[in-house]
């Protein structure tokens, strides 16, 4: 009885995973708070961590790795985010406080394996300016 039940559950699990994961899936991502090519101000009095928000479309269930490249070329690994469900804002937190950031060009790199689909890598370039508040 148990081997038959186990075989059925195993076969069902394989069927469901193959039905859900699309090997031809192309995962797209879009910046919500920082859009590629635009300039933004950062509050230099804030000691909050830098965050960025992305949405994904057409992705298999997986995670995306986020990296922030500083103007001097240093790379910071930010928290990973889920790539599903579609059109859901996902926030990544980076290990730098806003009051530690300098004015300059930053890159936000978003990459992932896309489950069993096509891997992806996107780059969002943005210029951040320190906003001095007194």
How should these model regions be labeled?
Residues 21, 116-134:
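Short beta-strand elements
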């Amino acid at each position: 009885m148990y081997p038959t039940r186990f075989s059925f559950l195993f076969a069902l699990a394989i069927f469901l995973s193959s039905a859900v994961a699309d090997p031809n899936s192309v995962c797209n991502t879009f910046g919500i708070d920082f859009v590629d090519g635009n300039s933004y101000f950062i509050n230099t009095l804030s000691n909050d961590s830098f965050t960025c928000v992305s949405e994904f479309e057409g992705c298999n269930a997986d995670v995306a790795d986020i990296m922030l490249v500083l103007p001097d070329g240093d790379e910071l690994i930010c928290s990973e985010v889920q790539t599903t469900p579609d059109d859901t804002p996902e926030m990544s937190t980076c290990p730098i406080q806003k009051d530690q950031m300098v004015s300059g060009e930053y890159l936000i790199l978003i990459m992932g394996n896309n489950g069993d689909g096509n891997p992806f890598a996107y780059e969002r370039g943005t210029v951040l300016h320190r906003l001095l508040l007194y």
